[in-house]
Curated annotation (Swiss-Prot):
Junctional adhesion protein that mediates heterotypic cell-cell interactions with its cognate receptor JAM3 to regulate different cellular processes. Plays a role in homing and mobilization of hematopoietic stem and progenitor cells within the bone marrow. At the surface of bone marrow stromal cells, it contributes to the retention of the hematopoietic stem and progenitor cells expressing JAM3. Plays a central role in leukocytes extravasation by facilitating not only transmigration but also tethering and rolling of leukocytes along the endothelium. CDD domains: IgV_1_JAM1-like (cd20946). This is Junctional adhesion molecule B. It comes from Homo sapiens. It is linked to Basal ganglia calcification, idiopathic, 8, autosomal recessive: A form of basal ganglia calcification, a genetically heterogeneous condition characterized by symmetric calcification in the basal ganglia and other brain regions. Affected individuals can either be asymptomatic or show a wide spectrum of neuropsychiatric symptoms, including parkinsonism, dystonia, tremor, ataxia, dementia, psychosis, seizures, and chronic headache. Serum levels of calcium, phosphate, alkaline phosphatase and parathyroid hormone are normal. Residues 1-28 form the signal peptide. Pfam families: Ig_3, V-set. The chain crosses the membrane at residues 239-259. Glycans are attached at N98, N187, N236. Residues 134-238 form the Ig-like C2-type domain.
Length: 298
């Protein structure tokens, strides 16, 4: 009896497992572990492949672009949005004829098909990376500088993907990243950062006078900004000394003039003249006041 009860219990457990597995297959979903990464150059084509079982007549396919908000790319057997004019369906796959940088992101295809146990859903995820060539970089080059000072030139591009590297040119000749390897006719005190695009002269000299341009380059392409001239002049020490001497002479002449006027009594005469005018005005006022008082009494 004990053996029979054990056999019955095992049979019940096996039946339960079969039902559970069938339920999972019917109503669950499966996705490939390895996610695809598709790389495409901007304005060229890309194919987003959906790695699922073969398509059947009753299969239903949907493509979605994932992000902050999920948007349909292919829904109810029709491409959505601007994909209508620049994409086509090849079986379960999407062929984008003209990729733009805004297409970059994650996409998911969902395939549902009826089975004996119910509706079966499978999905696959594809990441699209769009490579973009640099635009014309913005270059900041000072028009003038004094020798011996620190001068920094800047170059930047905000569109390239992957991020570009930068190279500086002087009078059309490429500047080496290590200035010590260059000729003796160039200033070896500069520092070039190919990642950030800065060119810094620790002590700029007259040898650095010239036309500077910058090139941004990545695996897709390169662009260069128009050249800008930088003029480096020596500090005019003799001119500064001459200006200081002239100012000192002017101040000295003005001081001597004031002393001479005081000795000649120009300032004292002016004071006595002001005193006489004030006394005469006071006398006139007192007489008028007296006459007015007398007439009032009468």
């Amino acid at each position: 009896m004990a053996r029979r009860s054990r056999h019955r219990l095992l049979l019940l457990l096996l039946r339960y497992l079969v039902v559970a597995l069938g339920y999972h297959k019917a109503y669950g979903f499966s996705a490939p572990k390895d996610q695809q990464v598709v790389t495409a150059v901007e304005y060229q084509e890309a194919i987003l492949a959906c790695k699922t079982p073969k398509k059947t007549v009753s299969s239903r396919l949907e493509w979605k672009k994932l992000g902050r908000s999920v948007s349909f790319v292919y829904y109810q057997q029709t491409l959505q949005g601007d994909f209508k004019n620049r994409a086509e369906m090849i079986d379960f796959n999407i062929r984008i004829k003209n990729v733009t940088r805004s297409d970059a992101g994650k996409y998911r295809c969902e395939v549902s098909a009826p089975s004996e146990q119910g509706q079966n859903l499978e999905e696959d995820t594809v990441t699209l990376e769009v490579l973009v060539a640099p635009a014309v970089p913005s270059c900041e080059v000072p028009s003038s500088a004094l020798s011996g000072t620190v001068v920094e030139l800047r170059c930047q591009d905000k569109e390239g993907n992957p991020a570009p590297e930068y190279t500086w040119f002087k009078d059309g000749i490429r500047l080496l990243e290590n200035p010590r390897l260059g000729s003796q006719s160039t200033n070896s005190s500069y520092t070039m950062n190919t990642k950030t695009g800065t060119l810094q002269f620790n002590t700029v000299s007259k040898l650095d006078t010239g036309e500077y341009s910058c090139e941004a380059r990545n695996s897709v392409g390169y662009r260069r900004c128009p050249g800008k001239r930088m003029q480096v002049d020596d500090l005019n020490i003799s001119g500064i000394i001459a200006a200081v001497v002239v100012v000192a002479l002017v101040i000295s002449v003005c001081g001597l003039g004031v002393c001479y006027a005081q000795r000649k009594g120009y300032f004292s005469k002016e004071t006595s003249f002001q005193k006489s005018n004030s006394s005469s005005k006071a006398t006139t006022m007192s007489e008028n006041d007296f006459k007015h008082t007398k007439s009032f009494i009468i």
